[in-house]
Regions:
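Short pre-active-site segment immediately N-terminal to redox-active cysteine/selenocysteine motifs
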Residues: 1-2, 9, 34, 146
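Thiol-/selenol-based redox modules, centered on thioredoxin-like
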Residues: 102-181
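Short, surface-exposed alpha-helical recognition segments that flank or form part
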Residues: 4-5, 126
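The substrate-binding groove and active-site-proximal loops of carbohydrate-active enzymes
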Residues: 1-4, 161
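Short, flexible loop/turn elements at secondary-structure junctions
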Residues: 1, 86, 154-157
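Structural microenvironment flanking redox-active thiols in thiol-disulfide oxidoreductases
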Residues: 7-103, 108-110, 134-135
């Protein structure tokens, strides 16, 4: 349920897959959920993989741009494996430590901010954590900012890039990594 994924990132990933599949590059798709849990779920992912059918905002956006067939189906097949992020029911106490662990990567200079600002941010994060129904393991472990996102791992299993939004730079990075070997 990510219009930007289906209009840009997935077609870009398909191009990368087609271009580099014979050079040992592997492309994997990962569906995640940080909202709209009624639509971002395993059943709808299976339906997408098996039939090409999309739902929710993706269906609305692609339909608006005339990019669907038979009303709700993609005009292309996704040729690489797709999995679902591990979603766990949010539970546990929201501690000051958890709140700060969330804040510091986003606002490194947090401690030097005025007290009123810090208190506002802490309250917003606390409210956000209280409202979270599920946690998406990969999404959170890689501190992804949203979708679409790309994670690039080299042949040795070393994380080389995590990016949000446009993925145009990935092709050049893959070329560079292939030349390293």
């Amino acid at each position: 349920n990510c219009p930007g994924c289906f209009m840009g990132a997935i077609p870009d990933a398909i191009k990368i897959y087609e271009k580099y599949k014979d050079e040992g590059v592997r492309v994997l798709g990962l569906a995640t959920a940080f909202e709209d849990f009624d639509k971002n779920n395993l059943d709808n992912l299976k339906m997408l993989v098996e039939t090409g059918e999309v739902v929710g905002e993706t269906k609305s956006a692609l339909s608006q741009y005339g990019q669907l067939q038979e009303g709700s189906k993609l005009s292309f097949k996704i040729p690489f494996p797709i999995g679902m992020d591990n979603l766990t029911k949010s539970a546990g106490e929201i501690t000051q430590e958890k709140i700060l662990e969330f804040i510091y990567p986003q606002i490194p200079e947090f401690d030097s901010q005025p007290e009123e600002y810090r208190n506002q941010i802490i309250q917003r994060v606390k409210d956000h954590m209280k409202s979270k129904e599920y946690s998406a393991e990969t999404f959170e472990n890689f501190s992804l900012q949203g979708t679409p996102s790309a994670i690039l791992v080299d042949r040795k299993g070393i994380l080389r890039d995590v990016s949000f939004g446009q993925t145009g730079h990935i092709d050049g990075m893959i070329q560079q990594l292939l030349n390293e070997d």
